[in-house]
Curated annotation (Swiss-Prot):
Catalyzes the ATP-dependent 2-thiolation of cytidine in position 32 of tRNA, to form 2-thiocytidine (s(2)C32). The sulfur atoms are provided by the cysteine/cysteine desulfurase (IscS) system. InterPro entries: Rossmann-like_a/b/a_fold, TilS/TtcA_N, tRNA_Cyd_32_2_STrfase, tRNA_thiolation_TtcA_Ctu1. It catalyses: cytidine(32) in tRNA + S-sulfanyl-L-cysteinyl-[cysteine desulfurase] + AH2 + ATP = 2-thiocytidine(32) in tRNA + L-cysteinyl-[cysteine desulfurase] + A + AMP + diphosphate + H(+). [4Fe-4S] cluster binds at residues 124, 127, 215. It comes from Acaryochloris marina (strain MBIC 11017). This is tRNA-cytidine(32) 2-sulfurtransferase. Binds 1 [4Fe-4S] cluster per subunit. The cluster is chelated by three Cys residues, the fourth Fe has a free coordination site that may bind a sulfur atom transferred from the persulfide of IscS. Its cofactor is Mg(2+); [4Fe-4S] cluster. Its EC number is 2.8.1.-. GO terms for cellular component: cytoplasm. Belongs to the TtcA family. Pfam families: ATP_bind_3. It comes from the Bacteria.
């Protein structure tokens, strides 16, 4: 079969990897430029959990570091939360092979969460809050200027709909976030990257994946329902998720209803009509 008519899945794995790697590098590079995620002299603390997303994040950032016109440091950090059967040597062995500076932080948050959360309830919320506090502390100790997390496009869209359906607010995950105490800058370089591309990349790179269910907890039913809904939409209408994500970059405050963000109270009719002004009244 001629290469001209070969699909991506029919390409040799090495060619698939190169093509996918170039795509992911391009998307990460665009996010970095669009949001000024990485600057000269930055010390980036890459949070590495052992899942496909954080492995991909570290891998792509290391490639970009070698090619970037600016100098920045990378420090990989893993939080060992003392979950049962956690394979403690997997990440150190992997990082030693890469010769990447890293730090393993041991904090028994698992026992704390098990003590506080009733049996059968999801532990993810409390676990996430404890983990965030520890990572902020470590970032300060390591003098990291940015904290890089592995959230991808679908994570951001799912969070948007979770907040829309269950919290009554339009809020997602920004590619760049200043912590509440204004001491830490969180970045999400994979913000433009589709989850399917990351999964395929992780498979081709054969990362030593550590299961995320060692603690026995699962995603909340709400998140599972939103994920399934979005997957069904994408299957029915390919490209819909990308359209939804683009909407987060194309906000029209005057077409929403938040009086704190748009001054509806002082809207006034102009003495002279504006030329070529679109009418969005919906009448």
């Amino acid at each position: 079969m001629s290469n001209l008519f070969m699909t991506a899945t029919q390409l040799h794995p090495s060619k698939q990897l190169k093509k996918l790697q170039a795509r992911l590098r391009g998307l990460v590079g665009k996010a970095i430029r669009d949001y000024n995620l990485i600057e000269a002299g930055d010390r980036i603390m890459v949070c590495l959990s052992g899942g496909k997303d954080s492995y991909t994040l570290l891998d792509i950032l290391l490639h970009l570091q070698r090619a970037a016109p600016i100098d920045f440091e990378i420090l990989a950090v893993n939080l060992d939360q003392k979950q049962p059967n956690f394979p403690e040597q997997v990440l150190p062995n992997y990082l030693n092979q890469l010769q990447v500076p890293y730090r393993i932080v041991e904090e028994d948050t698992y026992s704390t969460v098990k003590r506080v959360i009733p049996e059968g309830k999801t532990m993810c919320g409390l676990c996430s809050r404890l983990r965030r506090g520890i990572l902020y502390r470590v970032a300060q100790e390591e003098q990291a200027t940015k904290i890089a997390l592995g959230h991808h496009r679908e994570d951001i869209i799912e969070t948007l709909f979770l907040n829309l359906f269950h919290a009554g607010k339009l809020e997602a995950m920004p590619p760049k976030l200043l912590s509440d105490n204004r001491q830490h800058m969180v970045i999400r370089p994979l913000a433009y990257c589709p989850e399917a591309d990351i999964q395929r990349y992780a498979d081709l790179r054969q990362f030593p994946i550590i299961p995320c269910t060692l603690c026995g907890s699962q995603e909340t039913l709400q998140r599972v329902q939103v994920k399934q809904m979005l997957q069904a939409w994408e299957q029915e209408t390919p490209g819909r998720l990308e359209t939804i994500f683009r909407s987060l970059q194309n906000i029209e405050l005057s077409q929403l209803a938040d009086p704190q963000l748009f001054d509806f109270a002082h809207l006034a009719i102009a003495a002279t009509p504006y030329a070529d002004s679109p009418d969005r009244s919906g009448l």
